[in-house]
């Protein structure tokens, strides 16, 4: 019992000790951690606590986080003794001023965050003591001025952010002490760019040249250079004027204690700063109170002393330059004086063998002693020729060449020693350094004779021919280097040429001979002949030629030029080798020999025999196609699940969603092509395994893989055959007037030309490694012309990406935007449906392989993105056209792989209406029967936005933090790519509905289909007119428009299809016109409150239109802001190469690298082949490119990347070509674009200028179209625009009221007819009777000839009244030619025969009492029924008679068609619903 109390006592004692320990710990924590703050080790976080002052923290604190409080000021010493502090976060407070000593004792602070406060001023010594500071963030404050000494105490500062403040001016030298600077941001300030800011421009240029630092600063004022980078500003633009001296000082003698004045006045812009020099050293007025600089620049020296004696000079200096006065001397009269020069030696020229004297004398007390040395301070040689005169001069007799050089005169006494230097320039006889060589050239060429010489003085080069003066004409030119250039050499130019080097000493001469050979047109030395070969063999077609100059040999197959590839090889002499011949290679081959004199051609026919034998792959067909269907479908389904079941997770997902086809037919066609090619790949692998050979080697022939009958079987099972379209162009009433949505039947002879979902055309034959489907560069080790191809990403970072842009002084950003909008009317490549490789289903971005369909863009080892762990960028190949890549459309041969254009090639507003009937129906408002397009939400302006797309989560809902607004729905699925493009789609959707409503008012008898198609026709014509009359002339320039030529009418032999190189490389030049910022401007052309949008934030962001002001601010930012100038050294801004589709924690894409990779994927031949195609000179060395790419820096980069000119990819080469004056294109790019746009125009039967498409009155009105008018009519509230919105104009003087912009008068589309109630209805009772007349002959000028009218009258007389009972009709027969009687008689006989058949049919039907209508339904005699709401039919005596109800004019302005009613009615509440 005694033990228990003891235990209780012990227990109580332990409890007391525990409580005491806890109290001690708590007290220690309380002392170091402020109330309500979170403290962990040396980190203190006091966020969102409404603090108004800096709390006290422990001295060992390394991170102090005071964000999101209400701190208004920082007291000096607030952080005293926090010497361990490394990071200080004070952003998002209310600090207004940074006082001196605010950060005392923070010598180890590295990171200081002060952004998003209300800071207005910073004291001069505010950051003193921050010797370790590396990063300082002051952006988003209210700073207006900066003291130049504010940052001089920060030797280690690497990053300084000052953007989004109110800084207008910067004092020179503000950042000059920041030697460690790597990133400086001054953008989004109100910088006034005048002469005072040129020091900053020089600093930014220094940063850019060194490459060690990045900086951003843009001008806000004056308006004419608003948005320009400060680095691009020049003194000339700002009218800066160098100083000029207006009053000079004079020599002065003074005694001790007096005052002396040296006068100096200067003028300049800006006002020059006056600086005084004494003995070439700047005087400091601060260190000597006796020195004063007066307001007018005069130097006043008070209480003169002996130390003031010397040579004075005034220097006037400003940002544009400097000027100096003459030197004046201040002599101090008194005790011992230092030496001063009375006469200084001067530079002297002397002839060899003559004598020379350099004078030198000085004064001082005591009298100075004169001595001489050479310039390097070595004593003069002991030479009897060299003497010093009694006055101190240096005298040299019989001067030799070795006497040339620098000499120094020293004047010394007991007080001081001074010296002066001069040169003796010994003049010598000329000596040649470059001598001309004899040349043999061909008549008409240009020849250079190089000649250069040296001597003293520099000799002059003079040329003679045979001792006589050269002809005085433009052909003979002596360049400044001394080279003689003879242009267009003629036979009489042959002879001896003398180069003479002449100076005052004498002359030298050297001769060279010119031999001129006459020009000779190409003559064939060997020619090919018709040949028949077996499939799978290699064949060589001989062709060689002779001529002067030596001809170049090219080959064409069926009109398309052949290029070097795995399939074709052209030897140096011109022989064409075709590897692995298949039936696809059969055809006509033409060998063309060209030189500057002319050309010659010869052709042959190659026939290919296909022996009926089994092939190695036949046994594997069945199993391979089953496996191919399974693997392809599995990969596609996996991709669809990944993309459509959740939000986009990465830029890869965004790109895939953006490009993924939505039309079921497109998906089916792409799937079939993938299955077909995958099947043959599997067969190839089986054969390779069975034969144990390398099928990738050149010895294996693909045409031996599978026999033709099995290729047809694979085509059927894969779905290729099922997806062949059968075109029906029989409805000529429609096709003669309107376009189909898919582009078919435009060319009636070739209905598929230019249609959607067809293969791109080719200017040159495709280039694949294996000749069929393997891209160049897929094997990174394979050499081309002795060099491996560079990675596309390396080309992008080395050659294309740029952070510096130059504003276009002529054209607005709308020039770029129209180009992109137009491009989306012309082409869209169908990419692979799967993001995973077919072999094992792994995602392409994770495996970084080239297994189909993957073709990853590899990242070079030294790329900045390697740090994030990325090895590649996502990329999948484009889907092949069914039957290409492995087989022909006949499914019996191997054809090179071709790609699918998802759009119609014609300029037909397919981006507004869609390229298939399925797409067109999805965007039409079919319910209203008014011919309108569907509309979305209506804004405050009363105008609607585009409708929202429906379906699974889309690319527009990529970020949960942004507004969950889905994508807009338009005719092209890329409408949401960026906000500027979305605004253009909105404009044209509104334009359709505006025109449709107007046409329906003018023609209330038209049904919805008529209104829709007439409006679509007008909108397409407007886009054509804007493109060819307003946009193309600015892109092509005068030279390019001449290449395009005038419109001469429709040519059915021209294929208007888009050629592959245009879509894949050439028209992507527009990427170089894109600004990194989308500007948003209000009605006063000032930034809207939400600000501008960086490009990487403008992708897939429709919520910014819905929630942030609509389309008007974006449109003003397009036509009210200068575009990006296309400069070969400033191509794609880094928003496109480094932040494309960027998302958090992911690797963004690179548009330039994607463009290059896509070109290789599509088998686009190298740049050199297109040069030859465009009749530019062949370029076999990089020096040969100097005429088109003048920059030696760019040529050196190309050589470093590609090694050979024959390897250069087309896209980067087109981008770096120098612009043809007056255009925005280089010569090769101009050739390609003018070719494509000429084909688009001339090969379009329904081109708006083609006679008969529109009436003359309608065409006149259409030519009033302008994009300015479209903006005025369809924006929310834009009231002022330029007449030409593509050209830069100054607001408001260069802008016009919308009332002054010409408009299209739609009244010329009003029907003038007696039968209007049915004339405009597609499905009306009389459509088949009156259709063709109303479509073709609505206007007086369009009426046919007399005989044609008689034939039509006959057709009406005998055909119309019988067509109720017959199915045959003759309205579509072509009329006989006026002079062709035989043809006329034959046609009449045919009409009579058909009429007899109709009569017989009518008689048989009249014999019965029942009637059978057009749908095959029987009706009893004397019965009536409604065929449609407006038509009542009656069966009487076996004859059907129908009556159409006539509609009375409606009593309201906007009648509505109600389902089931014939005529439009007025709703009772129509007036009440009006706003």
Curated annotation (Swiss-Prot):
It is an enzyme of class 1 (oxidoreductase). Residues 189-241 form the LRRCT domain. The active site is at residue 824. Keywords: Basement membrane, Calcium, Disulfide bond, Endoplasmic reticulum, Extracellular matrix, Glycoprotein, Heme, Hydrogen peroxide, Immunoglobulin domain, Iron, Leucine-rich repeat, Metal-binding, Oxidoreductase, Peroxidase, Phosphoprotein, Repeat, Secreted, Signal. GO terms for molecular function: extracellular matrix structural constituent; heme binding; lactoperoxidase activity; laminin-1 binding; metal ion binding; oxidoreductase activity, acting on peroxide as acceptor; peroxidase activity. It is found in: Secreted, Extracellular space, Extracellular matrix; Endoplasmic reticulum; Cell surface; Secreted, Extracellular space, Extracellular matrix, Basement membrane. It comes from the Eukaryota. Disulfide bonds join 33-39, 37-46, 193-240, 195-219, 264-314, 360-409, 451-499, 543-591, 720-882, 729-745, 844-854, 848-872, 956-967, 1174-1231, 1272-1298. Its main location: secreted. This is Peroxidasin homolog. The gene is Pxdn.
């Amino acid at each position: 019992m005694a033990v228990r109390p003891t235990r209780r006592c012990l227990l109580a004692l332990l409890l007391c000790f525990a409580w005491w320990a806890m109290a001690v710990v708590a007290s220690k924590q309380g002392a170091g951690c402020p109330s309500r703050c979170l403290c962990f080790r040396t980190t203190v976080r006091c966020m969102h606590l409404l603090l108004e002052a800096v709390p006290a923290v422990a001295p060992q604190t390394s991170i102090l986080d005071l964000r999101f409080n209400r701190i208004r000021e920082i007291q000096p010493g607030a952080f005293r003794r926090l010497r361990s502090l490394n990071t200080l976060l004070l952003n998002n407070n209310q600090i207004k001023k940074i006082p001196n000593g605010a950060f005392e004792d923070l010598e180890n602070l590295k990171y200081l965050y002060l952004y998003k406060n209300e800071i207005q001023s910073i004291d001069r010594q505010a950051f003193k003591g921050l010797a370790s500071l590396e990063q300082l963030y002051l952006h988003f404050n209210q700073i207006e001025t900066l003291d130049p000494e504010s940052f001089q105490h920060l030797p280690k500062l690497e990053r300084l952010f000052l953007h989004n403040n109110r800084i207008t001016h910067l004092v020179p030298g503000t950042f000059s002490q920041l030697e460690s600077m790597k990133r400086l941001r001054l953008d989004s300030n109100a910088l006034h760019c005048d002469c005072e800011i040129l020091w900053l421009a020089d600093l930014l240029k220094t940063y850019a040249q060194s490459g060690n630092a990045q900086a951003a600063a843009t001008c806000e004022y004056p308006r004419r250079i608003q948005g320009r980078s400060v680095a691009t500003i020049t003194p000339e633009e700002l009218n800066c004027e160098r100083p000029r001296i207006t009053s000079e000082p004079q020599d002065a003698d003074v005694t001790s204690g007096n005052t002396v004045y040296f006068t100096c006045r200067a003028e300049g812009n800006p006002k020059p700063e006056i600086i005084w020099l004494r003995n070439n050293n700047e005087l400091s007025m601060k260190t000597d109170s006796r020195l004063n600089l007066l307001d007018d620049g005069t130097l006043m020296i008070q209480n003169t002393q002996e130390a003031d004696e010397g040579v004075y000079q005034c220097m006037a200096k400003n940002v544009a330059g400097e000027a100096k006065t003459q030197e004046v001397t201040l002599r101090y009269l008194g005790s011992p004086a230092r030496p001063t020069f009375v006469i200084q030696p001067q530079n002297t020229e002397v002839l060899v063998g003559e004598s020379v004297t350099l004078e030198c004398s000085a004064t001082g007390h005591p009298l100075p002693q004169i001595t001489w040395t050479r310039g390097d301070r070595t004593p003069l040689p002991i030479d009897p020729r060299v003497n010093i005169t009694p006055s101190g001069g240096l005298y040299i007799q019989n001067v030799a060449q070795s006497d040339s050089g620098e000499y120094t005169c020293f004047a010394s006494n007991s007080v001081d020693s001074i010296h002066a230097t001069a040169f003796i320039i010994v003049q010598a006889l000329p000596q040649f350094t470059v001598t001309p060589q004899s040349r043999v050239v061909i008549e008409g060429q240009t020849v250079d004779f190089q000649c250069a010489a040296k001597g003293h003085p520099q000799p002059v080069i003079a040329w003679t021919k045979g001792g006589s003066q050269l002809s005085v004409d433009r052909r003979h030119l002596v360049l400044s280097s001394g080279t003689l250039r003879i242009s267009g050499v003629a036979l009489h130019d042959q002879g001896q040429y003398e180069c003479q080097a002449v100076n005052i000493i004498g002359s030298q001469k050297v001769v060279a001979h010119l031999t001129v050979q006459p020009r000779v047109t190409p003559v064939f030395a060997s020619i090919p002949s018709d040949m028949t070969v077996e499939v799978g063999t290699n064949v060589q077609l001989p062709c060689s030629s002779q001529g002067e100059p030596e001809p170049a040999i090219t080959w064409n197959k069926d009109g398309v030029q052949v290029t070097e590839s795995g399939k074709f090889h052209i030897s140096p002499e011109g022989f064409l080798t075709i590897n692995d011949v298949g039936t696809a290679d059969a055809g006509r081959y033409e060998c063309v020999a060209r030189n500057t004199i002319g050309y010659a051609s010869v052709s042959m026919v190659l026939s290919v025999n296909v022996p009926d034998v089994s092939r190695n792959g036949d046994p594997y067909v069945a199993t391979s196609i089953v496996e191919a269907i399974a693997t392809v479908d599995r990969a596609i389904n996996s991709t669809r699940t990944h993309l459509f079941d959740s939000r986009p997770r990465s830029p890869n997902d965004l790109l895939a969603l953006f490009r993924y086809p939505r039309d079921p037919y497109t998906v089916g066609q792409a799937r079939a092509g993938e299955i077909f090619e995958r099947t043959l790949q599997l067969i190839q692998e089986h054969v390779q395994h069975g034969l144990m050979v390398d099928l990738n080697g050149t010895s294996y022939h693909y045409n031996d893989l599978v026999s033709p009958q099995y290729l047809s079987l694979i085509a059927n099972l894969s779905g290729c055959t099922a997806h062949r379209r059968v075109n029906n162009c029989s409805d000529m009433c429609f096709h003669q007037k309107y376009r189909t949505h898919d582009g078919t039947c435009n060319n009636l002879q070739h209905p598929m030309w230019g249609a959607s979902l067809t293969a791109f055309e080719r200017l040159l034959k495709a280039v694949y490694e294996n000749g069929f489907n393997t891209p160049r560069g897929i094997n990174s080790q394979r050499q081309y012309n002795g060099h491996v191809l560079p990675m596309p990403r390396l080309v992008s970072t080395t050659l294309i990406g740029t952070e510096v842009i130059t504003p276009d002084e002529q054209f607005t950003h709308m020039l770029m935007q129209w180009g992109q909008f137009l491009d989306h009317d012309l082409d869209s490549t169908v990419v692979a449906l799967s993001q995973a490789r077919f072999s094992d289903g792994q995602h392409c971005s994770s495996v970084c392989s080239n297994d189909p369909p993957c073709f990853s863009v590899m990242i070079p080892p030294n790329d900045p993105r390697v740090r994030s762990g990325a090895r590649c960028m996502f990329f999948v190949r484009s889907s092949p056209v069914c039957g290409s890549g492995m087989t022909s459309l006949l499914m019996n041969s191997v054809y090179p792989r071709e790609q699918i254009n998802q759009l119609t090639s014609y300029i037909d507003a397919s981006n507004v209406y869609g390229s298939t009937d399925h797409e067109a129906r999805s965007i039409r408002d079919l319910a209203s029967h008014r011919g309108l397009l569907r509309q979305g939400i209506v804004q405050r302006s009363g105008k609607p936005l585009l409708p929202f797309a429906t379906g699974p989560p889309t690319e527009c809902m990529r970020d949960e933090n942004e507004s969950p607004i889905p994508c807009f729905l338009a005719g092209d699925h890329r409408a949401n790519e960026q906000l500027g493009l979305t605004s253009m789609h909105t404009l044209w959707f509104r334009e359709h509905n505006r025109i449709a409503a107007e046409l329906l008012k003018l023609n209330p008898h038209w049904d919805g289909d008529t209104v829709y198609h007439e409006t679509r026709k007008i909108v397409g014509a407007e886009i054509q007119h804007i493109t060819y009359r307003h946009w193309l002339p600015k892109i092509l320039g005068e030279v390019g428009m001449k290449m395009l030529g005038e419109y001469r009418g429709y040519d059915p032999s021209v294929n208007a299809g888009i050629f592959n190189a245009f879509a894949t490389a050439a028209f992507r030049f527009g990427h170089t016109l894109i600004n990194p910022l989308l500007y948003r401007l209000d009605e006063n052309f000032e930034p809207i409150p939400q600000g501008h949008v960086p490009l990487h934030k403008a992708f897939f962001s429709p919520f910014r239109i819905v929630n942030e002001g609509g389309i008007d601010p974006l449109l003003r930012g397009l036509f009210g802001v200068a575009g990006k100038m296309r400069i070969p050294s400033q191509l794609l801004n880094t928003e496109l190469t480094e932040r494309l589709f960027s998302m958090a924690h992911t690797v963004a894409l690179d548009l330039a690298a994607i463009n290059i990779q896509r070109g290789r994927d599509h088998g686009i031949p190298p740049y050199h082949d297109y040069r030859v195609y465009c009749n530019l000179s062949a370029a076999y060395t990089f020096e040969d490119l100097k005429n088109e790419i003048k920059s030696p820096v760019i040529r050196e980069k190309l050589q470093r990347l590609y090694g050979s000119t024959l390897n250069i990819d087309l896209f980067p080469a087109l981008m770096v070509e120098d612009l043809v004056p007056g255009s925005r294109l280089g010569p090769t790019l101009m050739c390609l674009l003018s070719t494509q746009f000429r084909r688009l125009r001339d090969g379009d039967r329904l081109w708006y200028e083609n006679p008969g498409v529109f009436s003359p009155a309608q065409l006149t009105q259409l030519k009033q179209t302008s994009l300015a008018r479209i903006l005025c009519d369809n924006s929310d509230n834009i009231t002022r625009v330029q007449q030409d919105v593509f050209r830069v104009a100054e607001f408001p003087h260069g802008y016009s009221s919308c009332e002054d912009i010409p408009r299209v008068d739609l009244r010329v589309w009003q029907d003038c007819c007696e039968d209007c109630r049915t004339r405009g209805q597609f499905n009306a009772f009389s459509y088949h009777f009156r259709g063709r007349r109303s479509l073709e002959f609505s206007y007086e000028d369009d009426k046919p000839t007399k005989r044609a009218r008689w034939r039509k009258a006959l057709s009406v007389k005998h055909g119309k009244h019988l067509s109720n009972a017959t199915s045959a009709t003759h309205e579509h027969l072509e009329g006989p030619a006026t002079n062709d009687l035989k043809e006329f008689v034959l046609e009449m006989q045919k009409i009579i025969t058909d009429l007899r058949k109709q009569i017989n049919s009518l008689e048989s039907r009249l014999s019965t009492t029942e009637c059978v209508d057009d749908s095959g339904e029987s009706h009893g005699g004397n019965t009536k029924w409604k065929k449609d709401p407006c038509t009542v039919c009656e069966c009487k005596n076996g004859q059907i008679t129908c009556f159409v109800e006539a509609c009375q004019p409606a009593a309201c302005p906007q009648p509505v068609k109600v389902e089931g009613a014939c005529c439009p009615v007025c709703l009772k509440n129509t007036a009440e619903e009006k706003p």
